[in-house]
Regions:
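Gly/Pro-enriched, hydrophobic low-complexity segments
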Residues: 152-213
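Post-signal-peptide N-terminal segment of Sec-exported extracytoplasmic proteins
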Residues: 53-88
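C-terminal motif of bacterial Sec signal peptides marking the signal peptidase cleavage site
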Residues: 29-32
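Hydrophobic/aromatic beta-strand elements that line small-molecule binding cavities or substrate pockets
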Residues: 75-80, 102, 190-194
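Short, basic, low-complexity termini and linkers enriched in Ser/Thr/Gly/Pro
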Residues: 11-26
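Membrane-embedded segments
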Residues: 87-100, 104, 110
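Bacterial signal peptide processing site
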Residues: 34-37
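Acidic/charged, solvent-exposed loop-and-adjacent secondary-structure segments enriched in E/D, K/R, S/T
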Residues: 110-142
């Protein structure tokens, strides 16, 4: 079974899951007005190399965990490519009760088909939309640039508040992580791991400084 996890920031303690897979996550601390990305310099490479990491979802199922403040949701996340090339994403518990049902058109337009009332808050819906769009990995690369820290390459895609960074190894053979950033620091970090037949076996999304409410 594939695994998908979305969590809010970790504050005082590390959050650990105890099953056959293990997540240990800690919040990253920043101080002053210095930028987490100030060490990046222009790099060499083709921004389009990240397209090879776009998940080839046709009809995929994940065992999913979503933590929203005091609420913990677990169940099955279905991702299905529809005949019109849109993508349908449904999160439900194991007896079929839906938590949310979203669609993304081929052009990336978002539709909220359904969401559970306790989750139906503007900030939560916006965060879920942005998170899922991030891991579907269909960025517009028209204004993208390649930066480097001399260890990894960062394909920087401008967004309204900063950049989405697609971090790869120097040769762009491995997707290290995806970061949605403000102008100074990452606010969301996504990891797509253990690709098999074009599909990540595990997906982990963590918010660094945002509390769902």
């Amino acid at each position: 079974m594939r695994y998908f996890r979305l969590s809010e920031p970790i504050s005082e303690k590390l959050k650990v899951t105890t099953s056959k897979w293990l997540w240990v996550a800690a919040i990253v601390c920043f101080s002053g007005c210095s930028s987490y990305y100030k060490h990046l310099v222009p790099g060499k490479g083709d921004v389009h190399c990240i397209e090879q990491f776009t998940p080839q979802y046709v009809s995929t199922m994940y065992s999913a965990y979503v933590d929203v403040t005091k609420h913990h949701f677990s169940g099955i996340l279905f991702i299905k490519q529809m005949p019109d090339s849109s993508t349908r994403i449904v999160f439900a518990n194991e007896i079929g009760v839906k938590f949310f049902d979203f669609s993304f058109s081929k052009e990336g337009e978002f539709t909220k088909n359904y969401i559970l009332e306790k989750m139906d808050k503007k900030a939560v819906v916006l965060a879920l939309r942005n998170d899922l769009k991030l891991v579907l990995l269909h960025p517009s690369l028209n204004n993208a640039t390649v930066l480097t820290d001399n260890t990894n390459n960062f394909v920087a895609v401008p967004n309204k508040k900063g950049n989405d960074y697609y971090v790869t190894d120097k040769d762009c053979t491995r997707l290290v992580r995806i970061e949605k950033s403000s102008k100074r620091k990452p606010v969301v970090v996504a990891e797509l791991m253990d690709y098999k037949n074009g599909i990540p076996d595990s997906v982990h999304i963590q918010h660094k400084n945002f509390k769902f409410s």
